[in-house]
């Protein structure tokens, strides 16, 4: 490939798993000057983009890449890529958690059924894992509000088969060749 008679090399594909802290936005730049996830990977030479989004107040697993085809496959609803969150909500929802498993009516329609597991109820809050395959704006927070239990903290702990493991918050690692091939094979 040439541009203005000069050969142009295709940029090397890069695949990064980031443990995003709360307080960063999942965009390339912010007109309001807030910190972005790219600030956390400033030493990466290639121009990468977040695969999907995590809210400003949400922490956890975020993939960054310059592979547009893979980004499409991982974010398009038809591919139903599962994402698991560690959710802490106010109060003790009990039976209301079953509503999450049946789907919840939000302002933009009914959600697909979610999977709720590892529930730990305390006096003032309840923690559980929630797995969804949709990626609507602030979906987990809105689902929990819809059952009357606002989110206190939210962390994505799994994206497809990828997990944070012991990766410290604010740090990243490159995906292995096997992980990349497995992601590409999801769709």
Regions flagged by a language model, labelled:
Residues 1-187:
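Basic, flexible Lys/Arg- and Gly-enriched helix-loop patches that mediate nucleic-acid binding at interfaces
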């Amino acid at each position: 490939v040439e541009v203005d008679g000069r050969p142009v090399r295709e940029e090397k594909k890069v695949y990064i798993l980031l443990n995003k802290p709360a307080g960063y936005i999942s965009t390339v730049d912010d007109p309001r000057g807030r910190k972005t996830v790219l600030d956390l990977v400033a030493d990466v030479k290639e121009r990468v983009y977040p695969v999907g989004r995590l809210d400003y107040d949400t922490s956890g697993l975020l993939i960054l890449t310059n592979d547009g085809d893979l980004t499409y496959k991982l974010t398009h609803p038809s591919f139903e890529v599962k994402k698991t969150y560690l959710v802490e909500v106010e109060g003790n929802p009990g039976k209301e958690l079953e509503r999450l498993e049946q789907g919840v009516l939000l302002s933009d329609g009914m959600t697909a059924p979610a999977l709720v597991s590892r529930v730990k109820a305390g006096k003032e809050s309840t923690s559980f894992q929630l797995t969804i395959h949709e990626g609507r704006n602030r979906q987990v927070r809105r689902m929990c509000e819809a059952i009357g239990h606002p989110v206190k903290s939210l962390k994505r702990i799994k994206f497809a088969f990828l997990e944070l493991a012991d990766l410290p918050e604010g740090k990243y690692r490159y995906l292995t060749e096997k992980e990349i091939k497995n992601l590409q094979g999801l769709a």
